[in-house]
From Swiss-Prot:
The modification Phosphoserine is found at S973, S975, S985, S988, S996. One of its GO terms (cellular component) is cytosol. One of its GO terms (molecular function) is GTP binding. This is Rho GTPase-activating protein 190. Residues 1054-1074 are annotated as: Disordered. The record marks R1386 as: Arginine finger. The lineage of its organism: Eukaryota, Metazoa, Ecdysozoa, Arthropoda, Hexapoda.
């Protein structure tokens, strides 16, 4: 390593010689020797004291030794430098140069090539003088140095008292001397950061002098900026070393730019480092620097800028942190202040101020407000900025009042003031625009805004509002006028009640009927008003026809305001305060009279409960008062913020449980606690029974898919818990009111259900009070005189019993309150008098009254006209009122009844009804005798068919169909998730083609009141409890309740003829003898009003357009098969049990075929024997409902069922009828083909004549007695016109021999083809089995290891043979632990548990599930996953296609099966058994094992609510995997595949074990 001794020289001397400051020699040396910022000193002096001059550092010399340093070039060459600075020191006393020996001038002395100074120390800074020992001490080597080169300094900055000429002269003399001594040198200009351009050019001239011969290189430097310092010394070293490739000389501008970029980079890196690492403005410099010292960026910054710059940057960052914190806190206060303004100062007009002093007055107003301390606090000792640093202020949620002194707070107030004023203007404009729309006659229903926009141009209210606001107001107005127009149209239809009466008992409404109705009403303005909404108008007409045909509450156009519903509410409220009415459950609102207390428990994590409580308090005020339907409720709260232990100690007197969640974590916690609390202890006494629960979702700032997922999960949980679900985002403005309304309504419904019906067996009079739906008067005024009686006792939801004096004796009178349309259910009951109320403002009210009065003309009648307030004035002031009162009086005279008027605001007492009660009592015996005479004709004996098929039976009791709660039943009906599913089975696939009116709606779609969007498919929380009604399709015949449904017996005193049951008791041996029938001829049943599945149509117009307006009748209903025009909306009663009617063959001309009885039976075919064994049965006994197979099996095994049934009290007993095993016709959905109900001729059991006790004979047609072939069971039936009628099948004549011969040929050919096909399949299966055996022999490890290698350890067979061990253990565990678990297979288990279970079995097949502590629902889910994901499909694609054909889901044209098999249930059952026998043995064994498990589960359906229907719904997608192309295909196949699985469960002994089949119709 080369070592160089460099001497730095420049102009020196007194101020007269060098000017006020030096040329920068010391700074240049300092930066070169110690470049770090903390080691660089800018204050170097040449005026010293005598002591400093004589010290070891100066050592009485006029030069300084700066020490030695090592530098490396870019090429990696390393040099060592010893630096000498030649200067001239002045005496501080004389300001003259110190005299040291012989003194040469500085210009000559500085160019000396050798310097001597013994024991001279290294110079660092001026502070070192006098205290040398406190600094590093380094002695000049050997006390002498030979100078190798010179750095000549030229100052280019302007300095006072120094001329450039003097400096140029000095530099030129020095350079000349150095060149004479033949020493290398470089000319260095210093202070270029403050350079003067003239001086720079002078320096350049010096270096470019020709006599220097380019030996003088010019380097531009700046010691303060550390630019080109090393470059000057390295270049001099290379010149001394005579290196050819020297460093490149870079100009000052380029070096300065590079230096600036470096500094900026280091500064940004350190700034970013400090911002990331230092986030608390309380951190001290000592702590922060220690924390940052471990980072390279920080150390590099300190080297360049120094610690002082680092500390300055740190403190600047701390100040920014504090300012940010203050701004953040201020914004929080301002946000709270904005909310406080909305609450404390809702009306700016209350201030009565001008804009100038508004802010000052507002502050004074807030400071004097009564709730000031709730939102603000004052702290005179310190300002709010100082409070921020205090820990005590962190928990303070109120606003420091001195925040209002800031300009930002005033800005918030000004913005609030402007927004309030703008909102007032906007509200005014909206109101003006709404009034403009109401006053404009050209805005009609259905007209778009674009059509009338030009008419509003120039109006201020229209121009001021935005496009969105105008459209929103216009839409609201359209909704209002459309709703009003629909009400008027309904009113128009009701006014023509007399005309619509002719359609009441019509089975099929034709297109001509619709045209005639339209001709009658089309001239009315109320009809024309809906010209633009023709589809809705047409649908409303259809709905009205449906209501006329089946007048039940669900079809009432005033659904929510139906009188039947209002009466229930009124009687419930009135009876609640009566001491004779039993109290309800434990979850009640406390208090009595007009005030009640609601005790609410609010549960949620992460302060959600507290936030919800604050919202409730804001809505209910400080006193916690809430008014609902004129009833005041006082709210008490109890919250549990994440404390789910509150469930264990919950107060049984609470009124409702409100559960709130916002994210995945809070939902999982809430769901876990709810399930453990409400679902896991069902076998114990449930203290949460009837507890209203509301699930509230308040989403956080989540992604849209996460919000949608949590919303769906919440809705699924609410369905499982049978509670209500509220999404805060969808109705954030009034969701609190929705919560409180749901809790109160639930309590009311619970109280209504808790009232014990009062027996009404011994009443002296029964009076039916009829009120028309939609009348605009308060029903309470009518009911009040009755309920205020001290002897009042509530009999049921619609009747009360009052003890009253009639004449001289006290009589017990039952008042039945009903709507006009609800009177049909009391048609056959004994009623002693009718009281009809009608409104004097509605023509429709009187029109319907006239019809009802005509139907009961022989019974005492009281007509009461309800007028507006004003009494007599109402009669004279209103023409319509005068007309209707006069007409009502005339109706009363015509039917010999009494007439009275009743003012809506009139208070009357019970004596108001006394005159009519006296009249009813006087005519009691005549009415009862008349009732007995009429009742005798209803039924004449067993098995007769005298009742007309067009006679509509009465609906079931109101308390059954109207007040059934939407909860789990005890008869295995399953949860509400499955109650509304289609309940088809194999025996119900034969359906009539005509579509009845009830098909217009799904089971879960109900017509709503016109005010509540009657025509829209929307749900309403108020009626959630009544949405699943058992009797929602009741019309013309007794219902057949399919699998999974239940029927509750009536306990009212009613005379209702019961239709025969079509079910056989489980376990009875089917008989081959047929019961004798009273008649040899039968008629087709009428069809029940069905419902249109609106999900099959995207628009209402599609629904109306596809109503199947056909030109030919279907043969159903009247049984005539004539070609009359049919609308496709069958109004008959064919759905449900057949009742007293039976199918009969009808030929083309409408003639009936009579068949003689046959005897004998055929044993030639095993298939025929199975067919007959399934189809034939013993005499059927009458039952209350056509229940499911599971229900019948449970009833037969449970003796308590019969013992616990309450006898139905009836005024007139009827004989039991003999059940006829007829398939239950069902209404198919649009677009699917279903064949009509047919029964083979030889199974139609006909009596020879009479109804006497004759010996029953086998039911085989006479012309088939001698036939011994097995094919005679396949003779087709001709059932009138239709697909299988004379138009589509060969005409069936009475030439039996020819017909039978042709049929036998076809059947023999089919049997041969079937036999050959089966033989080929068997041969193919045998060949496959042989191949499989050969493969197994080749494998030394056997079948078990092969299965394990292919499918994993889960497929290892168990001890039971071919059953996988995983399947075996799961089934054993579920049957051991989960048969009593409610919703098994329906309630999913945890995915973590499922994955753990599979993992454990993969590791060890001998794993015991009991030891894993896994819930039974998780095991059930794992079992389903095993079938769907781990186990190969049990059914091949060909087998699945045959399953579809057997189920009847394919049309006849696409099916390989014949018509008989497609249309007959027993044939399909035999075909299903044959199909299962085609399965491979392993598949059949697994299928048999799992279905045997399903039988065990369904046998415990009373405990787990999973009967065969619900199991089929849960399992069919798993067992029968089909790739659906679209939803239409899925909806078409779903009911049939469900029935396949349900039948395999119900018929398990027959299909899998070879036993006799259960007969279910």
């Amino acid at each position: 390593m080369r070592q160089f001794n460099i001497s730095v020289i420049g102009l020196s001397g007194t101020e007269k010689d060098r000017g006020q400051v030096g040329v920068g020699k010391s700074c240049l040396c300092n930066r070169f020797m110690r470049p770090m910022a903390d080691d660089y000193f800018i204050d170097h002096i040449s005026v010293l004291s005598q002591s400093d001059f004589s010290g070891r550092i100066v050592n009485n010399d006029h030069f300084l030794y700066w020490g030695d340093v090592r530098k490396t070039t870019e090429e990696g060459v390393e040099y060592q430098f010893n630096i000498i600075e030649q200067t001239e020191f002045m005496d501080d006393s004389t300001f003259q140069a110190f005299k040291v020996g012989k003194m040469d001038p500085y210009s000559k002395r500085c160019t000396a090539t050798k310097v001597f100074s013994a024991e001279k120390l290294m110079y660092i800074c001026k502070n070192q003088l006098g205290i040398e020992k406190e600094y590093e001490q380094k002695v000049m080597p050997d006390g002498r140095l030979s100078i190798d080169g010179f750095v000549v300094v030229f100052d280019v900055s302007p300095v006072p008292n120094r001329s450039v000429e003097k400096q140029v002269e000095f530099v030129q003399n020095v350079i000349a001397t150095i060149l004479k001594n033949k020493k290398p040198l470089v000319l260095v200009t210093t202070k270029n950061d403050d350079a003067y351009e003239l001086y720079v050019r002078e320096a350049e001239k010096i270096s470019q002098r020709k006599d220097y011969k380019s030996t003088v290189q010019l380097i531009e430097t700046s010691a303060h900026e550390s630019i080109n310092i090393d470059l000057a010394f390295l270049l001099l070293a290379q010149m001394i070393d005579k290196v050819k490739n020297r460093v490149k000389i870079i100009s000052y501008q380029e070096s300065a730019k590079s230096r600036k970029e470096l500094l900026d980079t280091r500064s940004e890196a350190v700034t970013r480092l400090i911002r990331n690492q230092i986030t608390d403005y309380h951190v001290l410099w000592s702590q922060g620097s220690k924390m940052l010292s471990q980072y390279r960026e920080w150390n590099e910054f300190l080297n360049i800028f120094g610690h002082e710059a680092g500390q300055k940057l740190f403190r600047r960052h701390m100040k920014k942190l504090r300012d940010d914190h203050l701004n953040k806190k201020l914004h929080q206060y301002l946000d709270k202040f904005a909310l406080a303004l909305e609450y404390l100062l809702p009306d700016i007009g209350a201030l009565n101020i001008s804009d100038d002093d508004a802010w000052e007055c507002a502050r004074n107003y807030l400071q004097n407000h009564i709730e000031f301390e709730q939102y603000f606090f004052e702290c005179p000792q310190a300002s709010w900025t100082e409070l921020v640093d205090m820990d005590e202020a962190e928990d303070e949620a109120r606003i420091p009042f001195d925040v209002l002194e800031t300009s930002e707070a005033e800005t918030v107030f000004r913005n609030y003031l402007n927004s309030v004023q703008q909102d007032k203007k906007k509200i005014g404009w909206k109101q003006q625009f709404k009034m403009l729309l109401e006053e404009s006659g050209f805005v009609t229903p259905g007209k778009q805004l674009s059509e009338v926009r030009v008419l509003f141009m120039g109006r201020e209210c229209f121009e001021a509002l935005s496009e969105h606001d105008c459209q929103q107001i216009y839409d609201i107005h359209q909704d209002d006028i459309i709703e009003k127009s629909k009400q008027n149209f309904v009113e128009l239809l009701l006014e023509h009640a007399q005309y619509f009466l002719q359609f009441k008992n019509v089975d099929n409404i034709t297109q001509e009927d619709v045209r005639q109705i339209t001709d009658v009403i089309q001239e009315d303005s109320r009809y024309k008003m809906l010209d633009r909404l023709d589809q809705e108008r047409r649908l409303m007409l259809v709905q009205h026809l449906r209501f006329i045909h089946c007048p039940i509450r669900d079809h009432c156009p005033f659904f929510y305001n139906c009188v039947d519903s209002l009466i229930e509410e009124v009687l419930s409220d009135k009876s609640a305060s009566n001491h004779k009415t039993p109290s309800g459950g434990g979850w009640k609102s406390s208090g009595s009279g007009s005030d009640r207390t609601l005790n609410l428990l609010i549960v949620g994590s992460e302060h959600l409960a507290s936030d919800l409580l604050n919202d409730i308090r804001i809505c209910t005020g400080s006193k916690g008062e809430y008014i609902y339907e004129n009833q005041t409720y006082y709210l008490n709260y109890r919250i549990a913020n994440g404390d789910m232990e509150a469930f264990k100690a919950i107060d049984v007197y609470s009124s409702g449980l409100i559960c709130v969640y916002s994210n995945q974590q809070s939902f999982e916690t809430l769901k876990d606690n709810l399930e453990r609390t409400l679902l896991c202890n069902l076998e114990l006494e449930d203290k949460f029974e009837n507890l209203p629960i509301v699930l509230v979702y308040q989403p956080q700032d989540l992604k849209e898919n996460e919000v949608e997922y949590l919303r769906n999960e919440g809705m699924r949980l609410s369905e499982m818990l049978h509670c209500d679900f509220i999404d805060h985002t969808q109705n954030h403005q009034k969701y609190v009111y929705d919560i409180l309304n749901i809790v109160i309504l639930s309590l009311k419904l619970t109280e209504m259900k808790s009232y014990e019906p009062y027996p009404s067996n011994h009443t002296d009079l029964r009076i039916l009070c009829c009120i028309f739906c939609g009348d605009q008067y308060d029903i309470e005024n009518i009911v009040q005189p009755l309920v205020e009686e001290s002897t009042l006792v509530k009999a049921n939801e619609h009747s009360i019993i009052v003890d009253v004096f009639i004449g001289d004796a006290k009589r017990r009178v039952e008042f039945i309150l009903s709507s006009y349309h609800g009177t049909s259910q009391y048609r056959d009951e004994l009623i002693h008098g009718y009281i009809y109320f009608y409104s004097t403002k509605r023509r429709s009210s009187l029109a319907n009254l006239s019809i009802l009065a005509a139907q009961n003309a022989n019974i005492p009648l009281q007509i009461i006209a309800v007028t507006e307030s004003g009494g007599v004035n109402a009669f004279f002031n209103s023409d319509i009122c005068q007309f209707l009162i006069t007409e009502g009086n005339a109706v009363a005279d015509r039917f010999k009844g009494s007439f009275m008027t009743f003012s809506a605001d009139q208070y009357v007492k019970f004596a108001f009804y006394n005159p009519f009660l006296k009249t009813a009592w006087d005519n009691k015996y005549e009415v009862e005798n008349l009732h007995v005479e009429e009742s005798i004709t209803l039924d004449s004996g067993e098995g007769t068919l005298e009742n007309s098929v067009n006679q509509m039976p009465r609906p079931p009791p109101r308390h059954e169909s109207y007040m059934l709660s939407n909860t789990l039943g005890t008869d295995g009906s399953g949860s509400e998730n499955y109650e509304m599913a289609p309940t088809r089975s194999l025996n119900s696939l034969n359906e009539e083609r005509d579509i009845s009116l009830d098909e217009i709606y799904d089971d879960n779609e109900k017509p709503k009141h016109l005010h509540q969007k009657w025509l829209e498919d929307k749900s309403d929380g108020r009626r959630n409890m009544n949405k699943n009604l058992i009797w929602n399709n009741f019309s013309g015949s007794t219902h057949a309740y399919t699998t999974g449904r239940r029927h509750i017996d009536s306990n009212l005193n009613k005379i209702r003829p019961k239709g025969p049951s079509q079910t056989l008791k489980v376990g009875e041996a089917p008989s081959r003898n047929c019961p004798a029938m009273s008649s040899s001829t039968f008629t087709l049943p009428t069809q029940q009003p069905g419902k249109l599945n609106m999900k099959n149509f995207q628009l209402v117009s599609d629904a109306v357009a596809k109503m199947n307006f056909t030109g030919s009748g279907s043969g159903s209903g009247s049984g005539s098969g004539s070609g009359s025009t049919g609308l496709g909306l069958g109004l008959g009663s064919g759905s449900g049990c057949m009742g007293d009617s039976f199918l009969e063959p009808v030929d083309k001309d409408g003639k009936r075929y009579d068949h003689a009885q046959l005897d004998g039976e055929d044993e030639d075919s095993e298939e025929l024997a199975e067919y007959e064994q399934i189809y034939e049965n013993e005499d059927c006994t009458e039952s209350d409902s056509c229940a499911s197979s599971t229900e019948r099996r449970v009833r037969q095994q449970n003796a308590y069922y019969k013992a616990s049934k309450k006898p139905v009290a009836a005024k007139k007993q009827k004989k039991k009828k003999v059940a006829i095993p007829v398939q239950t016709p069902r209404v198919p959905p649009f677009g699917s083909y279903v064949s009509p109900p047919e029964i083979p001729l030889h199974y139609q059991r006909m009596a020879v004549g009479g109804s006497g006790p004759e010996k029953p004979e086998p039911c085989v047609p006479e012309f088939m007695k001698s036939d011994k072939s097995p094919e005679y069971s396949m003779v087709p039936e001709l059932a009138g016109a239709g697909i299988f009628g004379a138009e589509n099948l060969p005409e069936y004549n009475m030439n039996q021999a020819k017909c039978l011969k042709d049929f036998e040929k076809l059947e023999k050919r089919r049997i041969k083809e079937e036999t050959a096909r089966q033989r080929k399949l068997q041969e193919k299966e045998k060949e496959q089995e042989k191949k499989l055996k050969r493969k197994l022999k080749q494998n030394a490890k056997g079948l078990v290891e092969s299965a394990e290698a292919q499918f994993g350890k889960l497929m290892i067979t168990s001890e039971q043979g071919e059953i996988p061990i995983f399947l075996n253990k799961c089934v054993e565990f579920i049957e051991k632990e989960g048969l009593d678990s409610e919703g098994i297979y329906r309630v999913p288990g945890s995915r973590a548990h499922v994955d753990m279970l599979f993992q454990r079995f993969e590791e060890d097949t001998n794993t015991e599930i009991d030891a894993l502590d896994i819930p039974v629902n998780a095991v059930a889910t794992a079992l389903k996953d095993f079938f769907s994901k781990r186990l190969p499909p049990l059914f091949s694609k060909d087998i699945i296609k045959e399953l579809e054909e057997i189920a009847g889901s394919r049309g006849v044209g696409n099916s390989k099966l014949n018509v008989e098999v497609k249309t007959d249930r027993s044939c399909r059952l035999i075909a299903l058994k044959s199909l299962l026998q085609k399965l491979p043995p392993i598949n059949f064994a697994i299928l048999k094992y799992i279905f045997q498990h399903f039988v065990h589960v369904s046998d415990n359906s009373k405990l787990n609510s999973m009967d065969s229907k619900n199991l089929a719904i849960c399992w069919w997608p798993t067992l029968i995997p089909i790739d659906f192309t679209d939803m239409g295909h899925f909806e078409q196949l779903r009911p049939y595949l469900e029935d396949i699985v349900q039948t395999m469960i119900d018929q398990f002994p027959y299909l899998f074990c070879g036993k006799d089949a259960f007969v279910m119709v």
